[in-house]
Amino acid sequence: MSTAFAAAVVKQKVEAPISPMDARIDELTDYIMKTLLWQFHSRSWDRERQNAEILKKTKELLCGEPVDLSTSHDRCYWVDAVCLADDYREHYPWINSMSKEEIGSLMQGLKDRMDYLTIHRLLNEELSDKHY
């Protein structure tokens, strides 16, 4: 092997292959992280509930399913979900051609990613302080 070729191989960046679904999850995550403030709630259990409820209602809206609005919390999460679903339809038109099953998988992956980024990966101990 020539020295020039070996140097070129060393400089080459190696990246793990990314699936189309992961790429889409990245796009949607990026939108939330750069545009919306609800992911910055001060306690981990509130963040977890918000992620679950807002993204569940967003999925229901994107799939044309009924959304539970029976409590004031449901209605609060629904408002964020309506805005998010509308923005996703506008900024990411590929979501409009996905099946309900694909949207369900996409939104579950998005919830998992948001939980990781906003709860599980963080070292901020205030997030889990029971007295905060």
Curated annotation (Swiss-Prot):
Protein's UniProt name? Nitrogenase iron-iron protein delta chain
Q: What does this protein do?
A: The key enzymatic reactions in nitrogen fixation are catalyzed by the nitrogenase complex, which has 2 components: the iron protein (component 2) and a component 1 which is either a molybdenum-iron protein, a vanadium-iron, or an iron-iron protein.
* Highest taxon of source: Bacteria
The subunit structure is:
Hexamer of two alpha, two beta, and two delta chains.
Any GO BP = nitrogen fixation
Decide whether keyword Metal-binding is in the record. yes
Catalytic activity, per the record? N2 + 8 reduced [2Fe-2S]-[ferredoxin] + 16 ATP + 16 H2O = H2 + 8 oxidized [2Fe-2S]-[ferredoxin] + 2 NH4(+) + 16 ADP + 16 phosphate + 6 H(+)
Pfam families (alphabetical)? AnfG_VnfG
Q: Might you give the EC number(s) for this enzyme? A: 1.18.6.1
